[in-house]
Curated annotation (Swiss-Prot):
Classification via PANTHER family: ATP SYNTHASE SUBUNIT A (PTHR11410:SF0)
GO molecular function, one term: proton-transporting ATP synthase activity, rotational mechanism
Name of this protein: ATP synthase subunit a
Name of the gene this protein is made from: atpB
Compartment(s) of residence: Cell inner membrane
Subunit structure: F-type ATPases have 2 components, CF(1) - the catalytic core - and CF(0) - the membrane proton channel. CF(1) has five subunits: alpha(3), beta(3), gamma(1), delta(1), epsilon(1). CF(0) has four main subunits: a, b, b' and c.
Family: Belongs to the ATPase A chain family.
């Protein structure tokens, strides 16, 4: 059977430079992240501002309204301050996920270093803006209202641990779902290849895993959107803590 993990291996395209003894390389992951950015930029530039929107403009406007409504629902009107960040994260993750479904491509979001970097960006934004806007009142985030004084110290400790574990849970959720989905697809696709090599009987038997592969591909398209949405809505919820730490 073809190794289902092989698709996640990083291949060096060229060396950018060195920091000490550490090589800095432009890899397949770098290439597909750049591709996602180029595709998003092309979509934005090609959308136009026509009174009667075309296809690209309709897609961009739909994405804009979707993200804007998500922010308003989760973080209120003040959350629109972060629209450029949230919209960029949603589009980058969604486009990267869609590109990764195409055979023989690379799934950027299946690497924990990528998803953790995005989650860490959100985490640091929450901390920096939280202190910038609220000062020391930001610490109210760790002291929920209405908690009895007897158990308050325990609750504060739990809240602090929960807060600092956010980048881990935020990143692992996206990484694990994309990794598991692509491994499953690869396994069923390899069954098709193996059975197809066994002659007529094998080709007939390959119809079942082929059908499952097609069905799973459709499911992965839905997962590609759902995971981008989940990452986005969690980002909005976390940003709401920076805007309204006492709520």
């Amino acid at each position: 059977m073809i190794d289902p993990i092989e698709q996640f291996h990083l291949n060096k395209i060229f060396t950018i430079g060195h920091i000490g003894n550490q090589e800095i390389a432009f890899t397949t992951s770098s290439a597909y992240m750049l591709l996602a950015v180029v595709l998003i930029a092309a979509m934005m530039l090609g959308a136009g501002r026509a009174l009667v929107p075309g296809r690209f403009q309709s897609v961009v406007e739909l994405a804009y309204e979707f993200v804007a409504n998500t922010i308003r629902t989760s973080a209120g009107s003040h959350g629109m301050t972060f629209f450029p960040l949230v919209f960029s994260l949603f589009m980058f993750i969604f486009v990267s996920n869609i590109v990764g479904i195409i055979p023989y491509t690379f799934t950027v979001s299946s690497h924990i270093i990528v998803t953790f970097s995005l989650a860490l960006l959100v985490f640091l934004t929450v901390i920096i803006y939280g202190f910038y806007k609220n000062g020391l009142k930001f610490f109210k985030l760790f002291v929920p209202s209405g908690i009895p004084a007897v158990i308050l110290p325990l609750v504060v400790i739990i809240e602090i641990i929960s807060f600092f574990s956010r980048p881990i849970s935020h990143s692992v959720r996206l990484f694990a779902n994309m990794l598991a989905g692509h491994v499953t697809l690869k396994v069923f696709a390899s069954f098709v290849t193996m059975l197809g090599a066994l002659g007529f009987v094998g080709k007939v038997g390959a119809l079942l895993p082929l059908g499952l592969t097609v069905a799973l591909t459709g499911l992965e398209l839905m997962v590609a959107f759902l995971q981008a949405y989940v990452f986005t809505i969690l980002t909005c919820i976390y940003l709401n803590d920076a805007i309204h730490p006492g709520h």
